Protein backbone atom coordinates (compact mmCIF):
# COMPACT_ATOMS: atom_id res chain seq x y z
CA UNK A 1 0.00 0.00 0.00
CA UNK A 2 1.14 3.54 -0.72
CA UNK A 3 0.87 6.34 1.83
CA UNK A 4 1.00 10.12 1.69
CA UNK A 5 2.53 11.99 4.60
CA UNK A 6 -0.94 13.13 5.60
CA UNK A 7 -2.15 9.52 5.69
CA UNK A 8 0.81 8.47 7.82
CA UNK A 9 0.23 11.35 10.22
CA UNK A 10 -3.49 10.58 10.44
CA UNK A 11 -2.74 6.92 11.19
CA UNK A 12 -1.27 8.09 14.50
CA UNK A 13 -3.97 10.73 15.08
CA UNK A 14 -1.26 13.39 15.13
CA UNK A 15 -1.61 17.05 14.31
CA UNK A 16 0.85 18.64 11.91
CA UNK A 17 2.52 20.20 14.96
CA UNK A 18 3.08 16.81 16.60
CA UNK A 19 4.39 15.23 13.39
CA UNK A 20 6.79 18.13 12.85
CA UNK A 21 8.05 17.89 16.43
CA UNK A 22 8.60 14.13 16.12
CA UNK A 23 10.60 14.56 12.90
CA UNK A 24 12.47 17.62 14.15
CA UNK A 25 11.26 20.21 11.66
CA UNK A 26 9.05 23.28 11.84
CA UNK A 27 5.33 22.89 11.33
CA UNK A 28 5.66 25.07 8.20
CA UNK A 29 8.16 22.58 6.77
CA UNK A 30 5.89 19.62 7.53
CA UNK A 31 2.91 21.46 6.04
CA UNK A 32 4.88 22.19 2.86
CA UNK A 33 5.80 18.51 2.56
CA UNK A 34 2.16 17.49 2.90
CA UNK A 35 1.14 20.06 0.30
CA UNK A 36 3.99 18.98 -1.99
CA UNK A 37 5.48 22.46 -2.07
CA UNK A 38 8.81 21.01 -0.95
CA UNK A 39 10.17 17.56 -0.17
CA UNK A 40 12.10 16.07 2.75
CA UNK A 41 15.80 15.41 2.40
CA UNK A 42 17.32 11.94 2.87
CA UNK A 43 17.86 12.41 6.62
CA UNK A 44 14.23 13.35 7.20
CA UNK A 45 12.96 10.58 4.93
CA UNK A 46 14.86 8.08 7.09
CA UNK A 47 13.24 9.55 10.21
CA UNK A 48 9.81 9.30 8.58
CA UNK A 49 10.47 5.66 7.66
CA UNK A 50 11.50 4.81 11.22
CA UNK A 51 8.77 6.79 12.95
CA UNK A 52 5.93 5.42 10.85
CA UNK A 53 7.51 1.99 10.20
CA UNK A 54 7.09 2.30 6.46
CA UNK A 55 9.42 1.62 3.53
CA UNK A 56 10.58 4.45 1.28
CA UNK A 57 8.87 2.81 -1.70
CA UNK A 58 5.54 2.99 0.13
CA UNK A 59 5.65 6.76 0.69
CA UNK A 60 4.07 8.99 -1.95
CA UNK A 61 5.83 12.35 -2.30
CA UNK A 62 4.29 13.50 -5.60
Say what each PLM segment does.
Residues 1-11:
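A short, Lys/Arg-rich alpha-helix, primarily the initiator
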Residues 43-58:
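DNA major-groove recognition helix of helix-turn-helix/homeodomain DNA-binding modules
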Residues 6, 31-32, 41, 60:
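Key DNA-contacting residues within the recognition helix of helix-turn-helix
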Residues 13-32:
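Short alpha-helical DNA-recognition segment
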Residues 35:
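Short, conserved catalytic or interaction motifs in soluble domains
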Residues 10, 21, 50:
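Alpha-helical residues within the helix-turn-helix
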